[in-house]
């Protein structure tokens, strides 16, 4: 796929195992290109972590409410991760698109499968750790997981990294070993979208 060929602001989906640095990379993009991205706020049934704000980091909801929304077809993708539901609503996608902003989604591999099945054109990017052991060290170092949740996240990470090696499943794979190097790779993929969006707003 030609990185320089962009003729529409299709959503950009960034995925990868928990702890790989997806959020950090997205935050850097949003700071450098302030105003270009309309980061979509996903829904989740998990409890907020310290410092997380409802409507900013996630729309925090409960299982009955989210289950009803899924049944009604309100979500373009949803997944059950570590016993909690996550999902992206159609309304959130439309809100960003209507403002001529670039949609950037941080979703898991299950969510990617749902989007692919729905035939929604997207740019799929996988952020990979250099090794599984590195990821394990990062998760332990984060200090936010107990033994049970750490085990679950590592089991999920192993499954997700299998998808990384499926030919054609992702448009790009970026190894996040050195953050600035990984960010440089991500910028080179995203820059045609930034250029297209800037021209569209003129």
Swiss-Prot record:
Identify the InterPro entries for this entry: GK/Ca_channel_bsu (IPR008145), Guanylate_kin-like_dom (IPR008144), Guanylate_kinase (IPR017665), Guanylate_kinase_CS (IPR020590), P-loop_NTPase (IPR027417)
| Superkingdom per UniProt | Eukaryota
Name of the protein in question: Guanylate kinase
The segment(s) forming the Guanylate kinase-like domain are 9-191
| Catalytically driven reaction(s) | GMP + ATP = GDP + ADP
Q: Which GO terms describe its cellular component?
A: cytosol
Keywords attached to this entry: ATP-binding, Kinase, Nucleotide-binding, Transferase
EC number(s) per entry: 2.7.4.8
Q: Which Gene3D superfamilies match?
A: P-loop containing nucleotide triphosphate hydrolases (3.40.50.300)
Q: Which residues bind ATP?
A: 16-23
Disulfide bond sites: none
Recall the GO molecular function terms of this protein's record. Answer: ATP binding; guanylate kinase activity
Q: Which Pfam families match?
A: Guanylate_kin (PF00625)
Report the enzyme's class at the first EC level. transferase
Q: Which family does it belong to?
A: Belongs to the guanylate kinase family.
Among CDD domains, the record links this protein to: GMPK
Q: Which SMART domains match?
A: GuKc (SM00072)
Function of this protein? Essential for recycling GMP and indirectly, cGMP.
Question: Assembly and interactions?
Answer: Monomer.
GO process terms (BP): purine nucleotide metabolic process
């Amino acid at each position: 796929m030609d990185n320089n060929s962009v003729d529409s602001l299709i959503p950009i989906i960034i995925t990868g195992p928990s702890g790989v640095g997806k959020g950090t990379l997205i935050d850097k993009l949003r700071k450098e290109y302030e105003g270009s991205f309309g980061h979509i706020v996903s829904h989740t049934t998990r409890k907020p972590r310290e410092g997380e704000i409802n409507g900013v980091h996630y729309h925090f909801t409960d299982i009955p409410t989210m289950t009803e929304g899924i049944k009604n077809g309100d979500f373009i993708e949803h997944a059950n991760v570590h016993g909690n539901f996550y999902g992206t609503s159609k309304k959130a996608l439309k809100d960003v698109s209507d403002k001529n902003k670039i949609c950037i989604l941080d979703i898991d591999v299950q969510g990617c499968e749902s989007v692919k099945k729905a035939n929604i054109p997207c740019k799929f990017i996988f952020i990979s750790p250099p090794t599984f052991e590195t990821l394990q060290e990062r998760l332990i170092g984060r200090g936010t997981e107990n033994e049970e949740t750490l085990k679950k996240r590592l089991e999920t990470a192993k499954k997700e990294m299998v998808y990384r090696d499926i030919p054609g499943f992702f448009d790009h794979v970026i190894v996040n070993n050195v953050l600035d190097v990984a960010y440089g790779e991500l910028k080179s993929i995203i820059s045609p979208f930034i250029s297209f969006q800037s021209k569209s707003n003129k």
